[in-house]
Amino acid sequence: MLKKKKTEVYALGQHISMSADKARRVIDQIRGRSYEETLIILELMPYRACYPIFKLVYSAAANASYNMSSNDANLLISKAEVNEGTTIKKFKPRARGRSYPIKRPTCHITIVMKDISLDDEYVKINSLKKPRWKNKHTAMVYHDMYSSGGVWDKK
């Protein structure tokens, strides 16, 4: 029996103290990108969620270099997901003996990286791809060229 070589590694961050929606806003920007491009994006985005995600991406790359001895230039984020974690519930004391509940949401973030140099399917697909724009012979047309001149076309 032939054993397939491992092409994916992951890093998992649990109970990160932020809302899952705020983390998803950042994760949606990096999904499917290369490792180096992801680090640049995460350093330049102005969100608080970028730092824990940056640490997870860096950890997943370290896992890839240690477990698969892969190069950082060949890494691609194949899957990135955010799940809701437990909600931390506390009470804040207020005046006259009252208390207000505080709910701190947490989330679990999973980053899966793939080494494209080890993945045979990725190499085959990229070698078979042909640019689609070479087959089409369409000229660029100014969008207001065919306006009918009606009342609705004027600003």
Curated annotation (Swiss-Prot):
<dbReference type="InterPro" id="IPR047867">
    <property type="entry name" value="Ribosomal_uL22_bac/org-type"/>
</dbReference>
<keyword id="KW-0694">RNA-binding</keyword>
<dbReference type="GO" id="GO:0003735">
    <property type="term" value="F:structural constituent of ribosome"/>
</dbReference>
<keyword id="KW-0687">Ribonucleoprotein</keyword>
<comment type="function">
    <text>This protein binds specifically to 23S rRNA.</text>
</comment>
<dbReference type="GO" id="GO:0006412">
    <property type="term" value="P:translation"/>
</dbReference>
<comment type="function">
    <text>The globular domain of the protein is located near the polypeptide exit tunnel on the outside of the subunit, while an extended beta-hairpin is found that lines the wall of the exit tunnel in the center of the 70S ribosome.</text>
</comment>
<dbReference type="Pfam" id="PF00237">
    <property type="entry name" value="Ribosomal_L22"/>
</dbReference>
<comment type="similarity">
    <text>Belongs to the universal ribosomal protein uL22 family.</text>
</comment>
<dbReference type="GO" id="GO:0009507">
    <property type="term" value="C:chloroplast"/>
</dbReference>
<dbReference type="InterPro" id="IPR005727">
    <property type="entry name" value="Ribosomal_uL22_bac/chlpt-type"/>
</dbReference>
<dbReference type="GO" id="GO:0015934">
    <property type="term" value="C:large ribosomal subunit"/>
</dbReference>
<dbReference type="InterPro" id="IPR036394">
    <property type="entry name" value="Ribosomal_uL22_sf"/>
</dbReference>
<keyword id="KW-0699">rRNA-binding</keyword>
<keyword id="KW-0934">Plastid</keyword>
<keyword id="KW-0150">Chloroplast</keyword>
<comment type="subunit">
    <text>Part of the 50S ribosomal subunit.</text>
</comment>
<dbReference type="InterPro" id="IPR018260">
    <property type="entry name" value="Ribosomal_uL22_CS"/>
</dbReference>
<keyword id="KW-0689">Ribosomal protein</keyword>
<protein>
    <recommendedName>
        <fullName>Large ribosomal subunit protein uL22c</fullName>
    </recommendedName>
</protein>
<dbReference type="GO" id="GO:0019843">
    <property type="term" value="F:rRNA binding"/>
</dbReference>
<dbReference type="InterPro" id="IPR001063">
    <property type="entry name" value="Ribosomal_uL22"/>
</dbReference>
